[in-house]
Amino acid sequence: ADMAEAYGAEVIRLDFEWGKPADPDIVSAALDNESGIKAVMVTHNETSTGVTNDLEAISKRVKARPETLLLVDAISSLGCIPLPVDSWSCDVVAAGSQKGLLIPPGLSFITFSPLAWEAQKNAKMPRFYFDVAAAQRYLERGQTPYTPAESLFYGLDKALDILLGLG
């Protein structure tokens, strides 16, 4: 939310009791009470408390408004708990290498739904380093836009073998 505000987005914060999950009905009420909400951001699993938000229920509330994007922080959930991105209609999911993927920080992972790809094409906020369209163009050529932490790719390869072995 702080980063979105720094880029000029109008942010409506929903605060929930520390150590308690977000209430999907309160999320739904906020969407009903405020017109023009373009996206809902939610943390799937909060690291410091271990609270897992009911992302499936929140998604159902958000996706009752099909034009609203669901943005998910999966930093501490990816690789640890189920996260069926497509069936839960998550539009953007962002995660890092440093928690459930068993390796040091330095890699990030992001998924975009078709709706999110369309939204980023029309986005007016400034971007340079985190330009997903540029990253996609490089990916199509088998490259990265900047120098990657190559050693982490080797670690990720091993970590994924371990995770796949666990089922």
Residue ranges and their predicted role:
Residues 98-167:
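Active-site C-terminal subdomain of aminotransferase-like
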Residues 3, 26, 57, 61, ...:
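Alpha-helical scaffold segments in soluble metabolic enzymes
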Residues 1-36:
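PLP-dependent aminotransferase-like
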Residues 22-79, 92:
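Active-site phosphate-binding strand-loop segment of PLP-dependent enzymes
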Residues 15, 41-45, 74-76, 96-97, ...:
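Short, structured patches in soluble enzyme cores that scaffold and shape functional sites
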Residues 86-98:
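Conserved active-site segment immediately N-terminal to the catalytic lysine
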Residues 20-24, 47-52, 78-82, 87, ...:
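Short, well-ordered, mixed-charge alpha-helical segments that flank or form enzyme active sites
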Residues 5, 9, 32-36, 42, ...:
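Generic secondary-structure signature for well-ordered alpha-helical cores
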